[in-house]
């Protein structure tokens, strides 16, 4: 039962982080054509999960409860695949097909890249 509570608590924190950080990024970019706030939190979450999941797996730095809290709860709520999908569909629905395609490409390529970079960083720094 503690594990479920910790995942929920992490999810609450991650959701608040997503709201605050995503809004800040969107306002900072001044772009209303592309959802840079969602892209930014997805990139950050991908980078962090690359680092932290790698350290958890290779170095055993997290207990099962901590993994649930951080990886499933916080980072699961921070990254926003459902929001990404909704915003992309909205772009397509509004006739901005090039923007919708760019958003899909940017999210997939950059998030995969940042998971890889996070993993590489974790493996090189924390040997």
Please describe what each predicted stretch is:
Residues 1-127:
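Membrane-interface helix-loop junctions in multi-pass transporters/channels
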């Amino acid at each position: 039962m503690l594990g479920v509570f910790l995942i929920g608590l992490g999810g609450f924190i991650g959701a608040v982080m997503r709201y605050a950080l995503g809004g800040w990024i969107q306002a900072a970019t001044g772009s209303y054509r592309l959802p840079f706030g969602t892209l930014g939190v997805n990139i950050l979450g991908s980078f962090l999960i690359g680092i932290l999941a790698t350290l958890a797996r290779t170095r055993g730095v997290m207990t099962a409860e901590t993994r649930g809290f951080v990886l499933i709860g916080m980072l699961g709520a921070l990254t926003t695949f459902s929001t990404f999908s909704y915003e992309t569909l909205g772009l397509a629905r509004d006739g901005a097909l090039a923007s919708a395609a760019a958003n899909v490409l940017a999210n997939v390529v950059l998030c995969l890249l940042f998971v890889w970079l996070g993993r590489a960083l974790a493996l090189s720094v924390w040997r």
